[in-house]
């Protein structure tokens, strides 16, 4: 992957050690802007410390211990990404992989919690090997531009759907017919979300610094005043490393159990999903933050990929679900984040919230929904980057985008994009535009789905 941007003779001089380390001025940012971006990203993804323990708790994990583990993973991963890779991308327990761990591994296959953690650890080790040896970098380099932009468009649509569904604006259709329907349009969460989105439009148009963060804070305060569901539960609480039975999840993994033939296919499914899901997310966020070099490669991309994968190893050790770069990082880049200081702020806040867990309940979903919707809309601008002079490439990108949101699965969209690209090139007699890397990735993805290993 590309290295960091180089200082030119005409580039602004760093303003102190912090600026020099993170290259803040060189990337056209300020310390204040980076801190605000970090706060914005943190508020957009802090829901994970509630959602992840809730899902794993249903599978028999002690929720209090998982809360601590989730904060530790987000803190460790984001600090690694910020201090080492110097990129504004935050890491946390992936919601999709959390669901797979809880409902497929533990509840579905009746695998014990220690074995499930062993599977997460093995997934992280394999994932790191793929990243360090350059396989994942090779995948990124062989990602056609249409599919790369299509992934960004699809993730934007996905964010819109997640945010709209989270506040009840879009719901599962209760009657037979189309799969979704309009929810309770006049409900408090929906009205607050739409109002917040409109206010963000106005603040961003007027270039108000930290506009997204201001909206999140303002709606949280309104919710505390008018919404009975938003309650003050105190300020400080000591973190618990053990469950009610007194047992800790830290270092409780069973690696040998995860090597059993019945568990290994699930480990491989986790690896394949993580490789393409997180790779697409990293590419999309980097593109949105304009952190691509002249060859359209991610600046410090190799370090970003390794930070992502090493965090999953850490997850298995402390008793959490697999980690990944959060697409909510785009909320921070939309707020101006361009350096690792943004991710460092996120990591520090997740470690701080270990002791401030009651505050996490003061930020309702409808407070962060406007930020996610706004970021999703911004990511739709990738449509303008599609080269319709290369018709097959552009159409494959649109297939990728549409099916990410229709299937609610980033990897599925990428797979269908690759398939339509390769088949389209062949029937258009443009096989000379295909490279061996694209064909190999397509074959691997098709085999992954045909074998029934897809999540």
Swiss-Prot record:
Topology relative to the lipid bilayer, per the entry, is: Multi-pass membrane protein
**Pfam families listed in its UniProt record:** Xan_ur_permease
Q: What keywords would UniProt list here?
A: Cell membrane, Membrane, Transmembrane, Transmembrane helix, Transport
Q: Where are the transmembrane segments?
A: 32-55, 66-84, 87-103, 116-135, 148-168, 187-204, 209-228, 261-289, 303-318, 321-336, 341-355, 367-386
Task: Please give the InterPro entries that the UniProt record associates with this protein.
Answer: Azg-like (IPR045018), NCS2 (IPR006043)
- Report the protein's function: High-affinity transporter for guanine and hypoxanthine.
The protein's name in its UniProt record: Guanine/hypoxanthine permease GhxQ
Q: Which organism is it from?
A: Escherichia coli (strain K12)
């Amino acid at each position: 992957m590309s290295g960091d941007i180089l200082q030119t003779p005409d580039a602004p001089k760093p303003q102190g050690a912090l600026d020099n380390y993170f290259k803040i001025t060189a990337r056209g940012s300020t310390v204040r802007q980076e801190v605000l971006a970090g706060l914005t990203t943190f508020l957009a993804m802090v829901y994970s410390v509630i959602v992840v323990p809730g899902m794993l708790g249903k599978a028999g994990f002690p929720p209090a211990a998982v809360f601590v583990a989730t904060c530790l993973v987000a803190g460790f991963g984001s600090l690694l990404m910020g201090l080492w890779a110097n990129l504004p991308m935050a890491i946390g327990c992936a919601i999709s992989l959390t669901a797979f761990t809880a409902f497929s591994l533990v509840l579905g296959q009746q695998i014990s919690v220690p074995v499930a953690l062993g599977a997460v650890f093995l997934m992280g080790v394999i994932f790191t090997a793929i990243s360090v040896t350059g396989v994942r970098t090779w995948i990124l380099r062989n990602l056609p531009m249409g599919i790369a932009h299509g992934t960004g468009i699809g993730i934007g649509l996905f964010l819109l759907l997640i945010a709209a569904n989270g506040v009840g604006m879009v719901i599962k259709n209760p009657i037979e017919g189309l799969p979704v329907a309009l929810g309770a349009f006049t409900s408090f969460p929906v009205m607050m979300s739409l109002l917040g989105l409109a206010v963000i439009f106005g603040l961003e148009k007027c270039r108000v610094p930290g506009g997204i963060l201001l909206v999140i804070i303002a709606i949280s305060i309104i919710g505390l005043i008018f919404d009975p569901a938003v309650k003050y539960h105190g300020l400080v609480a000591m973190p618990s490393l053990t469950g009610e039975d007194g047992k800790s999840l830290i270092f409780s993994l069973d690696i040998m159990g995860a090597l059993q033939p019945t568990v290994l296919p699930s480990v491989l499914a986790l690896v394949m999903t993580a490789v393409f899901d997180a790779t697409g997310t990293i590419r999309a966020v980097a593109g949105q933050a304009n952190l691509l070099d002249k060859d359209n490669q991610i600046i410090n991309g190799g370090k970003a990929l390794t930070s992502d994968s090493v965090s999953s190893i850490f997850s298995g050790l402390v008793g959490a679900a697999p980690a990944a770069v959060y697409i909510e990082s785009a909320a921070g880049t939309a707020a101006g984040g361009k350096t690792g200081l943004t991710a460092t702020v996120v990591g520090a806040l997740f470690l701080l919230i270990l002791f401030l867990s009651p505050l996490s309940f003061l930020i309702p979903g409808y407070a962060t929904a406007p930020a996610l919707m706004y970021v999703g809309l911004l990511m739709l601008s990738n449509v303008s980057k599609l080269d319709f002079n290369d018709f097959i490439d552009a159409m494959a990108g649109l297939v990728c985008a549409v099916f990410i949101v229709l299937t609610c699965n980033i990897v599925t969209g990428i797979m269908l994009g690759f398939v339509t690209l390769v088949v389209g090139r062949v029937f258009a007699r443009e096989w000379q535009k295909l490279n061996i890397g694209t064909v190999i990735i397509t074959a691997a993805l098709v085999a992954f789905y045909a074998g029934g290993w897809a999540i």
